[in-house]
Amino acid sequence: PGHGDTHLDSHVALPVVEGTKEELAMHLAPFRSAVAGGVMGIMTSHILFPQLEKNNVPATMSRSIITDFLRSELGFKGLIFSDCMEMDAIAKHYGTVKGAVAALKAGVDLVCISHHVCLGCEAVEAVEAALDAGVLSEADLKQSTHNILMAKSMLAEEQRPPLSVVDCPEHRAMNQKLHRQSLTLVQDVPFALGDNPCF
């Protein structure tokens, strides 16, 4: 589920969505549609959903949400990746490194630690230790590796328009139109910024 009914930002706090299962069904509708439409990847949220997960862990670390609901119930076969594990919703309440291991255990394929390389290195060591201790399943991590490689393969094969399309006359005209429409006149003075798209 997404941030639709949250009042806190997971960058700085741990949001909780207390909705009933019926209310949550409304928030899950876009995800059902996206999965049915063949979306290739879904990012998890660092939000507590007590109606869906009884163990007081956010969706990113919830096997009930990631594996049981997203994979099994919705049938999602694509890539599941976490939001940054250094966000306060994880870092302050569970710890970035422990959270990374828990996210992989929940069924997340790709864990994002995007600010501090040292935390990424610690997470790699923690994952290796969790594998050795049997906390993480080698089969699950192999499946995640397969999911990552499949996503890369699909993206590599995808037909992309040439970059020259970006600088085509239609795009330049749209850029100029948006440029002019996005300015707000604060004082009635002649337009002085010109047509340079950098302004």
Residue map of PLM features:
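Preference for extracellular/luminal or secreted protein segments
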Residues: 72, 94-199
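Second-shell residues forming the walls of enzyme active-site clefts
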Residues: 1-139
